[in-house]
Structure formats: structure tokens, C-alpha cells
Amino acid sequence: MSDIVWHQHSIDKQSRADQKGQNPILLWFTGLSGSGKSTLAGALERALFDAGFHTYLLDGDNVRHGLCKDLGFSADDRDENLRRVGEVAKLMVDAGLVVLSAFISPTREERERVRALFDQGQFIEVHVSTPIEVCEARDPKGLYSKARAGEIKNFTGISAPYETPTAAELTIDTSKGDLATQVSALLDYLAAIQVIDSEKLKKAV
């Protein structure tokens, strides 16, 4: 039997959420490199923040500067990377925040493992379904060129698979329509499921 026990605090997550006037959730943006995950998540966070919501964006590149800087890109390391991010996101949701995360997260198993950490309705999977042809044409970091040249091994979409979500709450192709329209669709969805108050939302659009 473990000597480590869970310490129950006097302030629970519902109290923290009530103080902030919002329903905390995790929006998990998944898709290929260059699909527009970070751009879309960042624009949504800006809209929510400007309307007075308490948010935080976890970005795949940023966490590797600190939390996950000891990890590489092997299958095991990528799995551990997402495990850590999922646990951090859970703490943030417990703190009452609307959390946005932008990670390739290529396998259904990885994504479902993170989903299992959260209460029903608190994990919203957003599949950024931009076609690989568009992602490769964008190639903002030059990664596709390196992968095609064999300089990057196990690159998702080229030499490693991406498992398309089968039950994502939302699917957005960033090659169709403009960013403002896509953000508005996300805001409308969050209002419809009563994650955010529609009156506060009016300030964000």
C-alpha cells in the first residue's frame, strides 16, 4: 500500500470555477504540423481573454522549453510528453481555467488517455483537419522539407501515421474560410454547450 495519499483541499474546483464565472474545460486541438492548431487556439484564447474569461494556452513547442525539455521525439518520449501535458491541463482545469492545448497528438490512444483524466464534458477534442497537401505547402518551420529529405525520422504524416479522430466534438479545416469565422464557430459552440456565458461572449465577437 502506498504511503502517498490525496490531500483534500478546503476549496474545491467548483468554487474556483464559480469565482471566475465560467465552466472550466480543456479544448484539445489535434492535427498535423502546419494545420493551424496553434494559430486557431491562440486566436480563440485572445477572443476569450478579451471578453474577460480566464484562460491558458499550452503549446506543443513551448512546453519543450521547460516542462518537457528532457524529452526527445521517440514514441515513448512523445507519449510521456502528452502524459505530462494532460496532467498539467487537469490541474489548470481544476483551478477553474479554460485551457487550450495545441499538440499533434497523433494517436487515438494518447488523446483518449488525456480525455479519461477529465469529467464528462470537460474535454473538447478539436480536430484541425487541414489536408496534408496544404500543411506541407505552408511548412512554416521547414519540417516537411527535412522529413522528405530523410533528415527527420518518424515525422507525422510523412514517415509516421496520424490517426484521424473518430469522435471529435469539433472539426475545422483551416484552409476553408478565414480565421475570424473559425473562431466565431468555436465561440458559438462553447456558448451552446454553456461553457461560457453568452452575455460575456458578445464582447468577444
Swiss-Prot record:
UniProt catalytic activity: adenosine 5'-phosphosulfate + ATP = 3'-phosphoadenylyl sulfate + ADP + H(+)
Ligand binding (ATP): 31-38
Single GO term (MF): ATP binding
Keyword Repeat: no
Enzyme Commission number(s) from the entry: 2.7.1.25
Classification via Pfam families: APS_kinase
Keyword Transcription regulation among UniProt keywords: no
Pathway(s) served: Sulfur metabolism; hydrogen sulfide biosynthesis; sulfite from sulfate: step 2/3
Keywords: ATP-binding, Kinase, Nucleotide-binding, Phosphoprotein, Transferase
Residue numbers annotated as active site: 105
Any one Gene Ontology BP term: hydrogen sulfide biosynthetic process
Annotated family: Belongs to the APS kinase family.
Function (record text): Catalyzes the synthesis of activated sulfate.
NCBIfam families given in the database record: apsK (TIGR00455), PRK03846.1 (NF003013)
HAMAP family, per the entry: Adenylyl_sulf_kinase (MF_00065)
Name of the protein in question: Adenylyl-sulfate kinase
Organism: Shewanella pealeana (strain ATCC 700345 / ANG-SQ1)
Protein encoded by which gene: cysC
